[in-house]
């Protein structure tokens, strides 16, 4: 039942999902990294004020690029990724996406 709740936020392919003691995580390894990175950044931004500049936005965009490259090269069949690499590229992407979300929120509220 828990697994069905997550079907809308992740494809949940078993071969791309971490497992612990025979139980699969509710999301794939890349999404695990993305969600963990985003949660970590939101917690950080809640505790420590962050000033968002053009450099911050550029850095956030750069953090997403490795995930794009990993996913795209796998999709095109150039190579096969693994769960550690998926998680390792998902983590900074989650941080980058969280920063971009906070910047967007700031822009919307201060227009």
From Swiss-Prot:
InterPro entries the record matches: DUF2085_TM
Superkingdom classification of source: Archaea
Assigned GO CC terms: plasma membrane
Subcellular location: Cell membrane
Cell membrane found in the keyword field: yes
Membrane topology: Multi-pass membrane protein
Pfam family, any one: DUF2085
Transmembrane parts of this sequence: 45-65, 91-111
Keywords recorded for this protein, A-Z: Cell membrane, Membrane, Transmembrane, Transmembrane helix
The protein, known as: Uncharacterized protein MTH_518
């Amino acid at each position: 039942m828990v697994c069905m709740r997550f079907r809308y936020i992740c494809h949940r392919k078993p071969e791309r999902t971490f497992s612990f003691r025979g139980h699969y995580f509710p999301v794939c390894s890349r999404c695990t990294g993305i969600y963990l990175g985003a949660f970590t950044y939101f917690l950080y931004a809640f505790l420590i004020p962050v000033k968002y500049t053009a450099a911050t936005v550029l850095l956030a965009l750069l953090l997403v690029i490795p995930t794009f490259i990993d996913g795209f090269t796998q999709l095109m069949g150039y190579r096969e990724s693994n769960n550690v690499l998926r998680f390792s590229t998902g983590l900074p992407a989650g941080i980058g996406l969280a920063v971009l979300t906070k910047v967007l929120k700031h822009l919307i509220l201060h227009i």
